[in-house]
């Protein structure tokens, strides 16, 4: 069972009002979202789900598809994560996939929308934020009016808390080093008392 992760967080998620600022030592409930820049491959070895961190919040991962819907799907990589996009056409529940994935905090898709559909799996866990880092690479022009982080200067600086309205001219990218503290997932951000 996977209990410690480095989870990506973009400043806009806080700026949209979906979460408050985060600080070291804080307890925070959230689901995990994943995305992949290239298609995931059908896994030849289907026995063990895993996530091995490469850098930032990117992982080499293998997992089992647990849920398919028309416009989102979920996988178990040792911990559940969802993708707010139509699933690949050839994928069914039980299919094992592997490849490089980004793991981030659920911006709002799960807790505001997906969790309200009757067959959605429970995906929100409680986490302790053990450390916070902020990306230090400057933005460079990628053409076509797009700015991206300079990959040759990628780096992280530890900070005690996020400040989404000020950090990096409101464009900060954070890395939350988290430890999962709840065993049983749920659908709501606030646990029933």
Listing of model-derived features with the role each one plays in the protein:
Residues 3-14, 76-82:
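Short, structured beta-strand/loop micro-motifs enriched in basic residues and often containing a Trp
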Residues 9, 26, 30-34:
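OB-fold and OB-like single-stranded nucleic-acid-recognition modules
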Residues 15-29, 86-100:
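Short nucleic-acid-contacting surface segments enriched for D/E, G, S/T with interspersed K/R
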Residues 34-47, 105-115:
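Short, Lys/Arg- and Gly-enriched loop/turn segments at beta-strand edges
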Residues 49-71, 95-103, 118-168:
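Structural detector for short beta-strands of small beta-barrel domains
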Residues 70-75, 171-176:
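Short aromatic-glycine-enriched beta-strand elements
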Residues 80-86, 178-193:
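Short, surface-exposed beta-strand/loop "edge" segments at domain boundaries and coil↔beta transitions
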Residues 98-112, 116-117, 181-188:
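Mixed-charge, glycine-accented linear interaction segment located at domain edges/termini
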């Amino acid at each position: 069972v996977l209990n410690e992760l480095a989870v990506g967080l973009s400043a806009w998620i806080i700026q949209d009002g979906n979460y408050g600022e985060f600080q070291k030592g804080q307890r925070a409930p959230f689901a995990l979202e994943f995305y992949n820049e290239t298609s995931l491959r059908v896994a030849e070895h289907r026995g063990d789900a895993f996530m091995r961190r490469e850098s930032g919040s990117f992982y080499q991962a293998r997992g089992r598809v647990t849920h398919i819907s028309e416009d989102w799907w979920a996988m178990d990589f040792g911990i559940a994560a969802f993708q707010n996009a139509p699933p690949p056409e050839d994928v069914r529940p039980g299919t094992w996939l592997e490849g490089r994935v980004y793991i981030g905090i659920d911006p709002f898709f799960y807790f505001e929308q997906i969790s309200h559909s009757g067959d959605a799996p429970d995906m929100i866990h409680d986490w302790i934020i053990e450390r916070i880092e902020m990306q230090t690479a400057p933005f460079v022009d990628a053409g076509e009016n797009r700015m991206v982080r300079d990959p040759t200067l990628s780096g992280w600086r530890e900070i005690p808390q996020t400040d989404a309205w000020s950090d990096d001219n409101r464009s900060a990218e954070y890395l939350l080093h988290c430890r999962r503290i709840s065993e049983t997932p749920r659908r709501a951000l606030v646990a029933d008392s």
